[in-house]
């Protein structure tokens, strides 16, 4: 089985190493910077390099993971889908709704599987939280609390290309609210500040944001996201219902403690290592002709999470007025 990693930066390298561990297959590395593709190919078993997606398709490819920069996603996904290659694209498919929908409908028209990398769907803790919530173990859900805080922000030049903290980071949380409850978000009230990284204000972005959401059954949610949490990567969720509360995530993982403990998680790659590997395994199974995993992120998940993130942007830049996605 020939599998391509298109985009050989940090997240592409992470996926390549998961693919290595899951083998056997032939890995092809593709990147706009040939040296980066060569370096990753040398680090992984049974890997070669293709100069472009066009060359990759001409040589033959059974599945592809798009892990390039956000602005490159639409063009790469379009080329792969039109060539009939099952594709897993890191979120988001695009940073605007029309292109997201266009890519999704293109995949449906061609009958090509298109997954979006919402790896939290494959995290055992989040999956268990969803199963218990949807099964009614908590009774009527009243409130959700979600936290997503990075250790440190990416370079500003990269952030210029990836959208705001709402569409880049909190996008996961909007997706999780929908996925955990099976409900739709109908109102968003958001706010933000550039506290630790004031330079983000120059590009119309924030490093610390909050969002309050209302679902279509009047359940409420409180979301927070941030670019700066030096004590460790902090992602967790709590669902509060009539019969009790359930939570996922190391709520005490980032407490400094008396001795100033080391961070438990350095970033998404170790916090969600199990989830990423499970997602890749499920994707390869599907691409090889097996069943599609119901946990897989879809283009509609990406579209609807982006719709909420853009509503949060509008709210935060308009004096925190309520916005309907």
UniProtKB/Swiss-Prot annotation:
<dbReference type="GO" id="GO:0000166">
    <property type="term" value="F:nucleotide binding"/>
</dbReference>
<comment type="similarity">
    <text>Belongs to the Gfo/Idh/MocA family.</text>
</comment>
<keyword id="KW-0560">Oxidoreductase</keyword>
<dbReference type="Pfam" id="PF01408">
    <property type="entry name" value="GFO_IDH_MocA"/>
</dbReference>
<dbReference type="GO" id="GO:0017000">
    <property type="term" value="P:antibiotic biosynthetic process"/>
</dbReference>
<comment type="pathway">
    <text>Antibiotic biosynthesis.</text>
</comment>
<dbReference type="Pfam" id="PF22725">
    <property type="entry name" value="GFO_IDH_MocA_C3"/>
</dbReference>
<dbReference type="GO" id="GO:0016491">
    <property type="term" value="F:oxidoreductase activity"/>
</dbReference>
<protein>
    <recommendedName>
        <fullName>Myo-inositol dehydrogenase Hyg17</fullName>
        <ecNumber>1.1.1.-</ecNumber>
    </recommendedName>
</protein>
<dbReference type="InterPro" id="IPR036291">
    <property type="entry name" value="NAD(P)-bd_dom_sf"/>
</dbReference>
<keyword id="KW-0045">Antibiotic biosynthesis</keyword>
<dbReference type="InterPro" id="IPR055170">
    <property type="entry name" value="GFO_IDH_MocA-like_dom"/>
</dbReference>
<dbReference type="InterPro" id="IPR000683">
    <property type="entry name" value="Gfo/Idh/MocA-like_OxRdtase_N"/>
</dbReference>
<comment type="function">
    <text>Dehydrogenase involved in the biosynthesis of the aminocyclitol moiety of hygromycin A, a broad-spectrum antibiotic. Catalyzes the NAD(+)-dependent oxidation of myo-inositol to myo-inosose-5 (neo-inosose). Shows reduced activity with scyllo-inositol, minimal activity with L-chiro-inositol and no activity with D-glucose, D-chiro-inositol, epi-inositol, muco-inositol and allo-inositol. Is specific for NAD(+) and cannot use NADP(+).</text>
</comment>
<keyword id="KW-0520">NAD</keyword>
């Amino acid at each position: 089985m020939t599998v391509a990693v298109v985009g050989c930066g940090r997240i592409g390298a992470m996926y390549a190493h998961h693919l290595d561990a899951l083998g056997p297959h032939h890995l092809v590395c593709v990147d706009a910077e040939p040296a980066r593709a060569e370096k990753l190919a040398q680090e992984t078993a049974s890997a070669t390099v293709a100069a472009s997606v066009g060359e990759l398709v001409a040589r033959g490819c059974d599945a592809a993971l798009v892990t390039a920069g956000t602005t490159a996603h639409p063009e790469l996904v379009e080329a792969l889908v039109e060539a009939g290659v099952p594709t897993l694209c890191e979120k988001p498919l695009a940073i605007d709704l029309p292109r997201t929908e266009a890519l999704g409908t293109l995949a449906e028209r061609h009958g090509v599987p298109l997954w979006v990398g919402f790896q939290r769907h494959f995290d055992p803790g989040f999956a268990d939280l969803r199963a218990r919530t949807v099964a009614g173990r908590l009774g009527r859900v009243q409130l959700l609390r979600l936290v997503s805080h990075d250790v440190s922000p990416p370079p500003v030049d990269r952030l210029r290309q990836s959208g705001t903290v709402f569409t880049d980071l909190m996008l996961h949380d909007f997706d999780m609210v929908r996925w955990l409850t099976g409900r739709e978000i109908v109102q968003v009230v958001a706010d933000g500040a550039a506290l630790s990284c004031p330079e983000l204000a120059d590009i119309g972005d924030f490093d610390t944001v909050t969002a309050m959401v209302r679902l279509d059954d009047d359940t409420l949610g409180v979301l927070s996201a941030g670019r700066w949490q030096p004590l460790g990567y902090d992602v967790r969720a709590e669902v509060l219902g009539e019969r009790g509360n359930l939570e996922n995530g190391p709520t005490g993982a980032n407490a400094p403690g008396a001795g100033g403990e080391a961070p438990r998680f350095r970033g998404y790659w170790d916090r969600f290592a199990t989830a990423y590997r499970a997602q890749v395994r499920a994707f390869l199974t599907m691409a090889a002709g097996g069943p599609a995993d119901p946990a897989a992120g879809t283009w509609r998940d990406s579209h609807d999470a982006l719709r909420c993130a853009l509503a949060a942007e509008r709210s935060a830049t308009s004096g925190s007025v309520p916005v309907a996605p």
